[in-house]
Amino acid sequence: VATPYTTAEVFELDYFQSADVMTLVHPSHEPRELTRTANDAWTLEKIVFQPKQAFPTNVSVSPNTTGSENASYVVTAVNRDNAEESLRGTGSSFAISAITKANPCVVTATGHGVSNGDEIHISDVGGMTELNGDRFKARAITTNTITLTDTAGNDINSTNFTTYTSGGNVLIAYDEIANGNATADNTITWNAASGAESYTIYKEKNGIYGFIGRTEETTFTDDNIDPDLSDTPPKTRNPFKSTNNFPSTGGFFQQRRLFGNTNENRQRLFFSQTANFTNHAVSSPTKDDDAITATIAALQVNEVRHFVPLSDLLVLTSGGEWQVTGVDDRITPSTIQVKPQSYYGATTLKPIVAGDIAIFMCHGQHVRDLGYKFETDAYAGNDISILARHLFDFNTVVDWDFASAPFSSLW
């Protein structure tokens, strides 16, 4: 299996595993998954940070009674197995005729009909395939050109992308009707999405899309339903889209995949949606299963080094040890709490979990354990290398392992 990692980068790799999929992270490379599909079949691929549930296509709206009101709708698909909500369904499509290799990237699509701030989807591009299947926001619109930004508003730099050759389509991630009647009804239709159990429909009001209904069919009639703006469609995000934003460490906890420590945000924690490891979408207002972003900020720089899943989630940083919790033991966007437990600080050597404690290397080549103490209701530990300092003085531990049987031994 070919990899992008050099020999010098091997000891900077972090890895964590779920079943036959191992996640690999390095601060100079996009996160990847090493997957085993058979004993002699392995693949290493970049992680696509999008919902796995396919989105509806060919979303269209037709008025049952004509009028002079505008109405704009978003349709998403809901997965039948895990209730994951898809990206916004796409409606109008416009052919691409050119794409620049520049910063920012500019797409030419004659008469595209896109407005500033619209979410768009690009597909079927020849040559510059780096854009295919991704979501962008549009800015600096002219009649025939679109300047691309990511969904956070950062310009897309296509300077090092493959040269565009031909083809491609721009698809708008909503559909609008310009002659609907505010007191009558409009019918929204779309093509079915593979794996979907149902579809959620949102309508725009004052610039915000709110929930108006759900159906298992591929058609829905809006008979002047007032949108619920407390339930909005998810906004797709890829926090690791650009150089200097690749994570250095990660793990799993409470059915979320965790990442931390990018070159640009050393103290930041990134949690996927619950049970949807590739999905970092959020809603406004937030929902309990939304993706989470949090920053550890206290006393000094706390570069995130390791995630340790015990009965609680522990985060080891360069400056201390932290407990991550939520209300009623559930970590959500609105309840996440990050509490310091001690201030020893961990090196980059991957910690060992032995039974119900963590063993980690702290600064000065001291080995410490860390476990829950009932009497203080906190995590604490001891320097377990104190009786064998001669093994560590003037030496650097570069790797280690643990054997639980026949004797508990740290090698």
Stretches found by the model and what they are:
Residues 10-15, 250, 256, 264, ...:
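Beta-sheet-dominated scaffold domains
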Residues 1-13, 26-27, 91-244:
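Small/polar beta-strand repeat architecture
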Residues 1-23, 82-85, 111, 115-125, ...:
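N-terminal assembly/attachment segments of tailed bacteriophage virion structural proteins
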Residues 1-8, 37-57, 172-178, 214, ...:
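Trp- and S/T/G-rich repeat-edge/linker motifs of beta-rich repeat architectures
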Residues 87-90, 165-168, 406-411:
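Short, intrinsically disordered, charge-balanced linker/junction segments flanking boundaries
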Residues 48-70, 79-93, 171-195:
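Pro/Thr/Ser/Gly-rich low-complexity, intrinsically disordered linker/stalk tracts
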Residues 26-48, 144-153, 208-218, 265-272, ...:
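Short, surface-exposed terminal/edge motifs of secreted or surface/virion proteins that either
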